[in-house]
A protein has these predicted regions:
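Alpha-helical transmembrane segments and their immediate juxtamembrane cytosolic regions
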Residues: 1-170
């Protein structure tokens, strides 16, 4: 529901031009909602099966979003920065596909790896490299834009910490 509320308020401001005084909860959800969503997704990974298969489907949906937004740009319906290069669906798809690889790790080891990935992600944030193919990891090239961007570092770490939470709570 928070995602719907955030997008509704954004759309009202963007398309209709309403100047809304944003409540504190909106700012909090806007800034931290993505991380909360990824953690909850990791938590849910511990409850289901066929994670790799579901990950392929989610990743394919992310690719479809990329294709549609790229088409909008190429047809002149939107600017280049509307293209989604590695959004939340790409991220969650990759995380789900990787879950079977580390599922059997002990919970403390998984927590340690998750923390390391989160810290590494924040340490490399904003790093500019020449290689254009490294953006899914969080290493950006000059001029990179994406309307939805969730790099693997730090978000794979947040997903792993979500699986730790899922194991602990459930």
């Amino acid at each position: 529901l928070c995602v719907i509320a955030i997008h509704l308020i954004y759309d009202l401001g963007f398309f209709i031009g309403l100047d809304l005084h944003l409540p504190a909860w909106y700012v909090f959800i806007q800034q931290y909602g993505g991380v909360i969503f990824v953690i909850l997704s990791g938590c849910c990974a511990t409850l289901g099966s066929r994670s790799f298969r579901r990950g392929c489907i989610v990743f394919a949906c992310g690719l479809l979003i990329s294709l549609v937004t790229f088409g909008m740009y190429r047809l002149g319906m939107a600017s280049r920065d509307v293209i989604v290069w590695f959004g939340v669906l790409h991220l969650l798809g990759v995380c789900m596909m990787l879950y079977p690889v580390y599922r059997r790790l002990p919970t403390p080891a998984l927590a340690a790896i998750g923390i390391i990935l989160v810290v590494a992600g924040y340490l490399i944030a904003g790093t500019v490299v020449r290689a254009k193919f490294l953006f899914p990891l969080g290493l950006l090239y000059e001029g990179f834009t994406s309307s939805d961007y969730f790099p693997l570092l730090p978000h794979l770490g947040w997903y792993m910490l979500g699986t730790v939470l899922g194991r602990t709570v459930y």
